[in-house]
Every structure is written in C-alpha cells, then in structure tokens.
Amino acid sequence: RGAGFTICDVQPVVEVTGRVIQTRAVPAGAGVGYGWAVTAAEGMRLATIGVGYADGWPRQLSAVGGAAFEGRLLPFVGRISMDSLVVDVSALPPDALKPGDHVELLGPNRTPEQLALDGATIDYEVIARLGRRLCREYVS
C-alpha cells in the first residue's frame, strides 16, 4: 500500500464476488478455457464463476492470481472468458463449494494492489474497469 494508506485509517470500500455456476471434475488431458488454453496435467476439480471480461474483469489475470474462498486462494485456470472464469477447487473438500456459492474476486483477501501486480497494471485501473453488469449493493 502507498504512503497515504499508512498514515490514515483507510478501509477498503469495494468487494467483488462471483457466483459459482458449476463445479466439475476433469480428467488428466482435458482442455480448459477458450481454445483449451490449459490442459489438465492430472485430474482436477474446477468451478466456473459467472464473472468475465465483459464485467470488467482483466483478461491479464488469465492463469495468474485467483479467487478466495474461506481463506484459501483458488487459482485461475485458463483464459478469462467474456462471461466467466474458471478456478481450481481441487484443494477444497469435495462438497465445500457448490453452485450458487460466492467466491471473493476483490476484497480483503484479494486487494486491488494484488490484482494490479498480477495483471501488470495499477490498482486504480482495476477499480475503474469494473463494469455495469456487476450487481451493486451499497452498505452504510
């Protein structure tokens, strides 16, 4: 964090979560993402999340970084698609993440600064790119 954050008690004001659309097991050799950008070296459990680059999620984060769930980082797998992205949930217990659950894409565990480093950009761009398709909830 920049110097301004160390002298003020500034709290994060933005959190982005993505809803799990589906989970599935994929065997070794299966392709994942647009053009099968990734081939599973071994069997994996994957979750498709309903956020993509049309929502302002940076494509530069394809295969770097990840989402957070219950304190664990779930690595992105393959390319960020227009309407979805995929995370590896193999490290979670089999029924820990189900369709309808939410993962943290931006928030206390995945800060704008971290996303900017992963995506070779700046934290202001991460926030500015967030699109109108994302549901907004204002809290006091």
Residue spans for each PLM region:
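Active-site anion/phosphate-binding pocket segments in diverse small-molecule metabolic enzymes
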Residues: 1-140
